[in-house]
């Protein structure tokens, strides 16, 4: 029996589009289903000023295929040299919707990130004053901290002190991967939200390591124990408006994934909405999918919801998604959930 679900056109509140040929190849995969996306600024070199964000936005719009509608929501990469006045001007112009905090060395192209948080305090204070959200890659990078503990330690050592010392600062904990993070969000009464990725609702660390290394499941923050995956599912499907979709879809060519020091990231733009329908159906929460994917994010960012709609249809036969996206730089493998998916977007 065919089953369908029509929802407000969703948004992606954490997306990597890269630049150049890669941008042109992967942008349609997002624009096909999503109305808007928060665009990550970790290019080489990173997007650190309003002028650079404006130029990057122009390149994204120029790469958008004719007939597609999509609005890139730009961010700035926070560095120890970021100018509070430039941040305020970029926000006032309507260009920049958030500033991204990368602890130095935490993930792809994060070497320009923050090491001394006292040096960015004036920027954070200005952001609190003007209501501009801070998006955080929530991991410490200390060599003595186990990679599976980086998120929990970040909350204690970095995030909570920042929030305590900067009242009114609106924060998005991006791509949370632990029960600790979900519980922290719930424990706060205002000014805090969190994005959850599609792949962290599906995989745990066993998917990466059991039966041989699976490079296409390797991402940062790395997937955790099963108890954490289940906690993320509960948060995403709960209807709590503080949790919303941020895919962290991150295209890397197979050549860069399948090597002795492979890149971190899962490319989920192609099949995210179908996978989410599968997950929410498993949890008996299809009625909560629209909130998670289409309503909670705009509410946090104080933006209107999208005007359009998409329809998800469940078919009797499994849906065959592309295994790869061809790019001039080489193929990019589409995330494979390792189970049959019967949902598709029509």
Swiss-Prot record:
Biological process terms in GO annotation: 'de novo' pyrimidine nucleobase biosynthetic process; 'de novo' UMP biosynthetic process
What's the domain of life for this entry? Bacteria
Q: Which UniProt keywords apply?
A: Hydrolase, Metal-binding, Pyrimidine biosynthesis, Zinc
Q: Where does Zn(2+) 2 bind?
A: 100, 137, 175
| Catalysed conversion reaction | (S)-dihydroorotate + H2O = N-carbamoyl-L-aspartate + H(+)
Residue ranges of coiled coil: none
Please list the residues that carry the modification N6-carboxylysine.
100
> What cofactor does this chain's UniProt record say it requires?
Zn(2+)
Q: Can you tell me which residues bind substrate?
A: 16-18, 42, 137, 220, 252, 264
The residues that hold Zn(2+) 1 are 14, 16, 100, 248
GO CC, sorted alphabetically, is: cytosol
Q: What is its EC number?
A: 3.5.2.3
Record family assignment: Belongs to the metallo-dependent hydrolases superfamily. DHOase family. Class II DHOase subfamily.
The record describes its quaternary structure and partners as: Homodimer.
What is the protein name for this chain? Dihydroorotase
Q: Which organism is it from?
A: Ruegeria sp. (strain TM1040) (Silicibacter sp.)
Tell me the gene name.
Answer: pyrC
